[in-house]
UniProtKB/Swiss-Prot annotation:
Purpose of the protein: Responsible for synthesis of pseudouridine from uracil-55 in the psi GC loop of transfer RNAs.
Protein name (Swiss-Prot/TrEMBL): tRNA pseudouridine synthase B
Pfam assignment, any one: TruB_N
Location of the active site: 47
Reactions it catalyzes: uridine(55) in tRNA = pseudouridine(55) in tRNA
Positions of disulphide bridges: none
Gene that this polypeptide is encoded by: truB
Family annotation (NCBIfam families): TruB (TIGR00431)
Length: 317
């Protein structure tokens, strides 16, 4: 007999503003508990040092978390110049101290080097795996393993300020970009070394900065609900973004009610007007209810790829 899921069936996305000093998984578990969700997942971890946007997918929204993981990100970063650390951030040990002697022109020239399409060798202090183990576990044991340079794109790299030995930048980049590595490489290019002392993720995909909520805000709403003898969901659920926002950049295909039953059973249905081999966002009927994503083929058939399960929330515990 299958074990019944704990928590309620709730689908949506929370834009969490993660605080510094906590792991992304800790933040995820807190959000899951506040919403009493049966399932939750985040869309790309932030280092404990980092703050900012951490989209948390609840319920069926977890089926589309990969699309947010693959999306562009934006960061505000402050680097301390003149010191290099073994982790490329302030959590590590200082391994080298050098004078700061570059000119403004040299700084601007160095920044230009990182814009556009480049190759980046990931830090040893990352969650990437080598022979089944995260790189940071090797690093903690003093073992360096080979890492291949990976293609990344820096769409924008904006100079914000240079105050004393602290340099602040705004970086819009592709998935898989390590900001700590950019700062470490920049410090070496400038000849003085550098490491991250503040890192804040300000954007994931298209999600707006002003929609973020903190754990403290969620906790306060739960406390208010308990004080007023309300179900916490009555206050929390209004913060959820629809799960189809994770694939909002996909073109929509609306399937008529007459074909809906076939589609929801996993069968391809005939539609027209879209390019083949393209992922699409599927809605049903006149209500345009989101039910998943699919792919068009050359014959005008829409094949479902990931469909959501429609639950009766009244039966969830």
């Amino acid at each position: 007999m299958a074990r019944r899921s704990k928590g309620r069936f709730i689908d949506g996305i929370v834009l969490l503003d993660k605080a510094t000093g906590m792991s992304s998984n800790f933040a995820l578990q807190r959000v899951k508990r506040f919403f009493n969700a049966n399932k939750a997942g985040h869309t790309g971890a932030l280092d404990p040092l980092a703050t900012g946007m951490l989209p948390i997918c609840l319920g069926e929204a977890t089926k589309f978390s990969q699309h947010l993981l693959d999306s562009d990100k934006r960061y505000l970063v402050t680097a301390k110049l003149g010191q290099r650390t073994d982790t490329s951030d302030s959590d590590g040990e200082v391994v080298q101290t050098r004078p700061i002697e570059f000119t403004e022109a040299q700084l601007m020239s160095a920044l230009e080097h990182f814009r556009g399409d480049t190759l980046q060798v990931p830090s040893m202090y990352s969650a990437l795996k080598y022979q089944g183990q995260p790189l940071y576990k090797y690093a903690r044991e003093g073992i360096e393993v080979p890492r291949e340079a990976r293609p990344i794109t820096v769409f924008e790299l904006n100079f914000i300020s240079l105050e004393g030995d602290e340099l602040t930048l705004d970086i819009h980049c592709s998935k898989g970009t390590y900001i700590r590595t950019i700062i470490d490489d920049l410090g070496e290019m400038l000849g003085c070394g550098a490491h991250v002392i503040m890192l804040r993720r300000t954007q994931v995909a298209h999600y707006p900065y002003d929609k973020m909520v903190t754990l403290e805000q969620l906790e306060a709403l739960v406390a208010k609900a308990q004080e007023e003898q309300l179900d916490p969901s009555s206050l929390l659920d209004s913060l959820l973004l629809p799960m189809d926002t994770a694939v909002a950049d996909f073109p929509e295909v609306n399937v008529p009610d007459a074909s809906a039953a076939y589609l929801m059973q996993g069968q391809a249905v005939r539609v027209s007007g879209l390019v083949a081999d393209k992922l699409v966002r599927i809605t049903l009927g006149t209500e345009r209810r989101f039910v998943g994503i699919g792919e068009m083929n050359e014959d005008g058939l829409l094949a479902p790829k990931r469909l959501v399960v429609i639950h009766d929330q009244a039966k969830a515990s």
